[in-house]
């Protein structure tokens, strides 16, 4: 069997609990690949990972390799081929006696975490390592981590697949179609309520989703906020943020990056901008992407963006620029 080293932060969290068995079962990296898994947590809860490791052993997957629990980011990411940065400080938590409510505070406190993680990954992970940021605010966390890694050979992504999957599900339901018939979904911009889950270039059975649904008022006034704000009703209903669906989206992203994209389709993730579509360079921005299955990821070019789309993309671009400004002292 081939072997791959995979590091996961936030290993004792709810997302990881749904994610980890699927990483070592053969589903994500293939049945011919043994997965050496490194689970990383803060010192206060790292002991809980021993129970998770016992459960992974008890699953009995042939593809499960070595299992390590650590509170040391350097030990965790050493020689990693994939690093999934799931852990982050959520809004509402109390740090040093202060409740973290403002997005600017959230950006800065997570910025410190992703500074350390980026430095360790840049120095110790595989030279061609792939890094997926799941922990929010994901785009700017990825910007900080990538900047601090100082290793341009490594590939950084922020996850927008959860938004893309939510968008596909809503479009399919409205059209009375199978979700598998919804293709070419792009979530432009930030993983936040300013995101633009593009219904004009998404297709249902090969036809523009907007044309297929034929209800422009629903598309622009109901569909968009439904997808953009989906996280809140999930929290309200279950008393916690999305976990299983977020884990599923992380797996979808890893598979989309590692495998060749189907001809004519694309997938959605946030990557460093190369200036495409007028997005400022190096901003971690949600784009339509293709993979050649050999590590080369390209931004799809030539997609038509109408005035409505361009206005929405400007809003999310401006938000990301303001986030970048808020953490500029961490980007030096």
Predicted regions and their residues:
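C-terminal substrate-binding/catalytic lobe of Rossmann-fold NAD(P)-dependent dehydrogenases
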Residues: 148-154, 164-332
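Redox-cofactor binding/interface segments in oxidoreductases and associated redox assembly factors
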Residues: 83-85, 133
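N-terminal Rossmann NAD(P)H-binding glycine-rich loop of SDR-like oxidoreductase domains
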Residues: 8-12, 20
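Short glycine-rich anion-binding loops that position phosphate/pyrophosphate groups of nucleotides
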Residues: 88-91, 137-138
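Rossmann-like NAD(P)(H) cofactor-binding subdomain of soluble oxidoreductases
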Residues: 98-170
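Residues forming the Rossmann-fold NAD(P)(H) cofactor-binding site
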Residues: 17
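Conserved N-terminal Rossmann-fold NAD(P) cofactor-binding segment
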Residues: 25-80, 89, 95-96, 325-329
């Amino acid at each position: 069997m081939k072997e791959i080293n995979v590091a996961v932060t936030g290993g004792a969290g709810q997302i990881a609990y749904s994610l980890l068995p699927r990483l070592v079962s053969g589903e994500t990296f293939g049945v011919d690949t043994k997965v050496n898994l490194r689970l990383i947590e803060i010192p206060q809860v790292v002991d809980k990972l021993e129970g998770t490791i016992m459960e992974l052993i008890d699953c009995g997957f042939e593809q499960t390799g070595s299992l390590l629990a650590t509170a040391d980011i350097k030990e965790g990411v050493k020689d990693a081929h994939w690093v999934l940065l799931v852990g982050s400080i959520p809004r509402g938590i109390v740090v040093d006696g202060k409740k973290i409510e403002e997005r600017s505070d959230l950006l800065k406190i997570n910025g410190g975490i992703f500074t350390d993680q980026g430095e360790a990954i840049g120095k110790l992970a595989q030279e061609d390592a792939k890094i997926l940021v799941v922990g929010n605010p994901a785009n700017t966390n990825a910007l900080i981590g990538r900047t601090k890694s100082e290793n341009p050979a490594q590939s950084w992504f922020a996850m927008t697949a959860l938004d893309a999957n939510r968008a596909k599900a809503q479009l399919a339901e409205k059209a009375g179609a199978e979700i598998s018939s919804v293709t070419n979904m792009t979530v432009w911009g930030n993983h936040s309520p300013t995101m633009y889950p593009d219904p004009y270039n998404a297709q249902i059975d090969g036809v523009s989703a907007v044309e297929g649904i034929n209800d422009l008022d629903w598309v622009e006034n109901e569909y968009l906020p439904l997808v953009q704000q989906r996280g809140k009703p999930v929290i309200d209903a279950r008393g916690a943020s999305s976990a299983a669906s977020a884990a599923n989206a992380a797996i979808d992203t890893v598979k989309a990056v590692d495998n060749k994209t189907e001809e004519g389709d694309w997938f959605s993730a946030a990557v460093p901008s190369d200036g495409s579509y007028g997005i400022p360079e190096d901003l971690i921005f949600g784009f339509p992407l293709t993979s050649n299955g050999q590590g080369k990821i390209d931004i799809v070019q030539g997609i038509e963006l109408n005035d409505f789309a361009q206005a929405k993309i400007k809003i999310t671009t401006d938000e990301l620029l303001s986030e970048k400004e808020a953490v500029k002292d961490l980007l030096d």
